[in-house]
Amino acid sequence: MERGKKKRISNKLQQTFHHSKEPTFLINQAGLLSSDSYSSLSPETESVNPGENIKTDTQKKRPGTVILSKLSSRRIISESQLSPPVIPARRPGFRVCYICGREFGSQSIAIHEPQCLQKWHIENSKLPKHLRRPEPSKPQSLSSSGSYSLQATNEAAFQSAQAQLLPCESCGRTFLPDHLLVHHRSCKPKGEGPRAPHSNSSDHLTGLKKACSGTPARPRTVICYICGKEFGTLSLPIHEPKCLEKWKMENDRLPVELHQPLPQKPQPLPNAQSSQAGPNQAQLVFCPHCSRIFTSDRLLVHQRSCKTHPYGPKYQNLNLGSKGGLKEYTNSKQQRNRAAPSVTDKVIHATQDALGEPGGALCL
């Protein structure tokens, strides 16, 4: 009986070991299974004592097993995830330039500062004397521990750059000196009248213009004496021969009565007013209908669309400057008015004929 019970118990344990999903191992440890219970549960194996020979069944050999639960593996994984790896900073912090206030890398700030300081000296020398500023000094900021702090250094550099800005007299906003002139053109203070003129406003603006005009002014233009268009002083000598050749070709195409003499180049005056004069006045022709002035080649184009006088070609050919011609035109107009009956007379005569009262008065 006892032997049958032991076999059933061992078979059940083997079935549970085979059906379980976890890897299972059995070891003979003190405190887990006693020697009697272990021998009763697994009759095929015997307890192992050091110094004795191992006696096992040659038909069924089974290694010692250890039971590992899932909970222990989860604890090991969770313990390894408690300390994540430290990711270093991707790039160093920016440094603020104490002259212009812009940000640069720690390597490029050393290259930028000498160039920025040189540019500052050039712009400061162009300003008027009352707008010139002292050379900015590089701030040296120390932390409480006596070491340099990047944040404190950047803050001091930014304050140094902001100290170079000039306030606007109207709105109070701050600008760089070269940008202040551009702002003055469009500055409209709110709720205030026109701003008070500067004591030396003309000198002030002139000085700012000279200081801030980094680009050269527009070159002076000269007007061509043939076509009247504006050209630069360097391009005008190239244009005039071509324009004169073109003028000759267009003049040859005109009718004989509209031919113009060759335009003469005006002599330069000492006050340099010749550059502002238009084309030669000898080239201009009056329209006989509307008295507008055109060049000879444009007059033909204008006459196609010119609205002639409503009284016809007789009035156009009439010389209004002579008194006889004007009287003749006035007398002819009066005769036409007398000969032609008015519309009212026609209506009255038609009504009288309908009533059978010729020559009678119409009573209304």
Swiss-Prot record:
Residues 1-21, 37-60, 127-147, 187-214 are annotated as: Disordered. Zn(2+) 2 binds at residues 168, 171, 183, 187. A zinc finger (C2HC/C3H-type) spans 93-122, 164-193, 220-249, 283-312. Residues 138-147 have a biased composition (Low complexity). Its cofactor is Zn(2+). Zn(2+) 4 binds at residues 287, 290, 302, 306. Residues 1-10 have a biased composition (Basic residues). The keyword Metal-binding applies. GO terms for molecular function: zinc ion binding. Zn(2+) 3 binds at residues 224, 227, 239, 243. PANTHER family: C2H2 ZINC FINGER CGI-62-RELATED, ZINC FINGER PROTEIN 474. This is Zinc finger protein 474. It comes from Homo sapiens (Human).
